[in-house]
Amino acid sequence: MSKVRLLDQVRQTIRVLHYSRSTEDAYCYWIRFYIRFHGCHHPIELSAAHVSQFLTFLAVHRNVAAATQNQALNAIVFLYNRVLQQPLEHIDNVIRAKRSRRIPVVFTRSEVQLLFRNLKQPYLLMAGLMYGGGLRVMEMLRLRLKDIDFERKSILVRAGKGNKDRVTILPDNLIENVQHAMDRVAAIHRQDLAEGYGEVQMPYALARKYPNEAQSLHWQFLFATAHRSTDPVSKKEMRHHIFETSIQRAVKTAMHRAGIHKPASCHTFRH
């Protein structure tokens, strides 16, 4: 079995389990790194001791953060448990990366108001949903039209942290702007359909079970991009959601304009 085929297996398994694209990319990166670290030996030939050596190398020689080391461990455990279906024995004798003891950065109410005044749509609505609904940045970006419930004033967050669904509030002051965003997506979708497109990326299992649903309006992303792009999985031209870097850049720019000098990010809206 070649390395290429192994990584293809990893990607396929991740997609069956509905993990995010960022998790897929991260896991493949660490698995590839792990294999190369051990001289390109197939993981089936390696043991828990080899995993310990790799994790220790990351902490001692690469000086990675604890979260980074844990991500590498999760990727390798996933490889053995889910892909190779040969769980490792207990992994011990690992030098753990040191955890930072930083106090979480928090925006004051006045800072939030300043930030909002320096944000334009659709980024203002995005920030509002993260702040008022407690959404993580990728949870917000992956919202579909069907996830918004105006009657109950709620938002369904699909496959959030831990791959779990949950319901959160839709703040009253955001309802009008959410409706405007949905109207925009509906207009874009009509144009896409007229041009012979209109598909959106679907969760793996649903895409196979309901192939026609990919063109349904209710599955379209709330924060759709201005232009279509080629989906890396299906190779079809689709309309994806706005990139994470776009909202991150908008928030950083708004912080600069507002004179807020904190090591903050989109995640700070949740604190």
Language-model regions: role of each:
Residues 1-271:
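Conserved catalytic core of the tyrosine transesterase superfamily
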